[in-house]
Amino acid sequence: VELPELHVFQRQARARRHGTQELLEGAQLRAARWSLDDRDAEGALERLAELPQGAARRTLALRIRLKASRLAGRTREALDTARLLGKHRAFSSDAARSLVRGLAIELLNQAHDPAQLQAAWLALDAQDRAMPDIAVHAAQRLALLGGDGAQVRQWLLPVWQQAVELPGALAQPQGQRLIAALESALAGLDAAWLARIEAAQQANPRDAHLQYLAGMACVQRQLWGKAQQQLTQAAPQLQDAGLQRRAWRTLAELAERRNDAAAAAHAWKQAALAH
């Protein structure tokens, strides 16, 4: 065979191999999709595992993997796949963010003790952990599972720093969840965190949520006078019934501590009226 003809022959052979490979990959993808349609998640994942690496990372294969992983309860694998789909721009940025957030929260919810939750938290990437919804949810779950309060506060610190820099952020539902998460971790509050809370409150003196948190922090530090002052100002202004009720109850207990029966009766009445 002459040299030019040899090159033509080689190109044709490569094209045939490429075409055959594409046919095989297409058949594997169809088989995976059929397995998924039959709700055979493990079967679909097995078909996908047989694909070459390049084909397995294509958008269609990743979409099937995402659905199969979720169906199989493999949340961590689904989360990794969702991130890849986001990088491939398979979804809008908002949709990708929402999907990752939902899967991350699902992964955190599968933890049933602080050690499992710590492992799930570390399985998230830094971008996931920086999402306020994820960080607050993780912190609330850690508190619910009896985790260390200092660890809860550490997870919340980046979110806290973002929130106090945005005027009015703590009045939003997300900000109120942050306040509730921090309140659940006030036991053992150190001086550094008290200083952070008080500095934020002083910078935003009209923010009832910060006044409330500062007051509850002062209760934990046994700074009774400061606690009474902050909570007295915050209680009538709070829009959240649960926070308002707790503020009035705490004021009632502080009044009882100083043997002020009239103030205690008034605070208990206000707590009962909060709704």
Language model features with spans:
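Structural motif corresponding to the intra-repeat A-B loop/turn of tetratricopeptide repeats
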Residues: 38, 72, 110-111, 145-146, ...
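C-terminal non-catalytic interaction modules
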Residues: 229-233, 237-275
